[in-house]
């Protein structure tokens, strides 16, 4: 199997002090900003971006207790899908990988060709009823998804099930016990409650997420439920524009959904930031964890404040800048 980035990740701890001098501003995200502590209290916190100077594509982040857990993309490199842990969203430690090797095709062993740039992409990580779940779909034949589970990410993962391919998927456990996956350009499919496969006769539909602006690719699904509403985050490349982070919200999981651009800005002189998720800490503060393309370095990890304004999770400032 291929080696490289996985070895860089393995047992590596990144240390960037939380009190560094560079943070976000309304224009360039380079000045200190205030992060909301609650409706009555505001406290200034600064940090340096990128918080991880390494390739951390397609991040998904959850919080379980005092720890944040993040999973990223390694494509053809193995061991694959690093799972990282942090107490502050800045200092991350790799605690495991979802898998040591994939054997879907001889190409993973460089036989009958190669899978460079393909393999494992855009994993979704979730925690439900005392168990961690991770779902991803390799971007190559035979185009099927993997579901891995564990009771403790630091102790390794077990393959739970295989099912159809879901591009850039987001696994979602609803309050009523039903389980769904959002993927592609607004696709929504219901799964069996035990994640053994697609639920026969369950929800299987395409949400109305396209409009006059959104005629191109939409991907990078990340879903949360907040104050009774469903929030679907995706990225888009509008015609003639640059990548931006969108949010769709609805009162019902099947919609209808309304759209808001929650992040659209350059950062530190590099192309627009886009694709990631939002997460809260134990005190109720919210943050955006988003990657940014940095050429040969890869897709570095950035951290931004997330302010709930009129029911929308705005990243950076109130205008998504």
Regions found by a protein language model. Give the residues of each.
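Carbohydrate-active catalytic/glycan-binding domains of CAZyme proteins
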Residues: 10, 29-321
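Bacterial N-terminal signal peptides
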Residues: 17-25
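Bacterial N-terminal signal peptides that target proteins for export
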Residues: 10-17
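Single conserved hydrophobic/aromatic residue that forms the stacking wall/gate
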Residues: 1-9
């Amino acid at each position: 199997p291929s080696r490289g980035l996985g070895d860089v990740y393995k047992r590596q701890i990144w240390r960037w002090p939380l009190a560094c001098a560079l943070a976000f501003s309304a224009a360039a995200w380079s000045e200190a900003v205030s992060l909301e502590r609650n409706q009555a209290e505001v406290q200034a916190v600064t940090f340096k971006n990128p918080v991880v100077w390494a390739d951390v594509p397609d991040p998904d982040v959850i919080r379980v207790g005092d720890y944040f857990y993040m999973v990223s993309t390694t494509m053809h490199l193995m061991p694959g899908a690093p799972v990282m842990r942090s107490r502050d969203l800045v200092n991350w430690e790799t605690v495991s990988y979802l898998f040591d090797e994939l054997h879907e095709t001889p190409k993973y062993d460089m036989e009958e060709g190669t899978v460079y740039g393909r393999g494992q992409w855009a994993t979704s990580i979730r925690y439900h009823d005392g168990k961690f779940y991770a779902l991803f779909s390799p971007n190559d034949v035979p185009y099927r998804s993997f579901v891995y589970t564990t009771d403790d990410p630091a102790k390794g993962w077990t393959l739970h099930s295989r099912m159809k391919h879901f591009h850039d998927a987001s696994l979602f456990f609803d309050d009523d016990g039903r389980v769904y996956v959002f993927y592609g350009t607004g696709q929504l499919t219901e799964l069996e409650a035990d994640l053994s496969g697609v639920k026969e006769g369950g929800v299987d539909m395409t949400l109305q997420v396209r409009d006059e602006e959104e005629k191109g690719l939409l991907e990078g699904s990340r879903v949360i439920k907040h104050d009774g509403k469903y929030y679907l985050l995706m990225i888009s490349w509008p015609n003639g524009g640059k990548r931006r982070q969108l949010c769709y919200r609805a009162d019902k999981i099947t919609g209808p959904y309304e759209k808001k651009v929650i992040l659209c800005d350059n950062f530190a002189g590099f192309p627009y930031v886009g694709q990631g998720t939002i997460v809260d800490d134990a005190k109720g503060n919210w943050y955006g964890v988003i990657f940014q393309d940095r050429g040969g370095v890869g897709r570095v990890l950035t951290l931004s404040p997330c302010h709930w304004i009129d029911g929308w999770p705005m990243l950076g400032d109130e205008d998504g800048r």
